[in-house]
Amino acid sequence: NDNPILPFQLIEKIHSETNLTLADVIYWKKKNSMPFQSSRTNLSRIVEPVYVFVNKQNLKSFKTNKEISKINEKTNQKFYKHYTNYIEAKNNDSIKTKLKATYSSELVTKLINIYFTKGSLIYDPFSGIGTTAVGCKISDCNYIGSEIKEEFYLQSIDLIKKVDKIKDI
């Protein structure tokens, strides 16, 4: 198991060495904890952090897809529908794969619906089996992805074709 400090060290490096900064942390509660208990010291994780990065100059102004629930008539202040940083979604799309780090198109779709409007272009540098592409298709967003392992790339093409067939019905 990796040292739990590593993600925080990476976040600090991203902040200090790039034009990006951490804007939010969302916690994804999976339906099942993974990995299975094989460690004497570590607990099995049922919650995973999802880190949201933005350009530093956009930290207070980046756009989301949050709904306005009310506008104060006197001050024009906007109030938004209540969103929390805790999302429940299944672990994966029940696809048999050798890829160990999969997440579900359900999680992706929920994140897209918070942060992106229809027609947005989303890039996934580690496409894996294509769950981000599926979330984009479901949410009417455009998608570009990269995957270096041909096996996972081919699985992603099959998964995307299945979603296309469902959307055509």
Regions found by a protein language model. Give the residues of each.
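Core catalytic lobe of class I
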Residues: 1-154, 162
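S-adenosyl-L-methionine
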Residues: 157-169
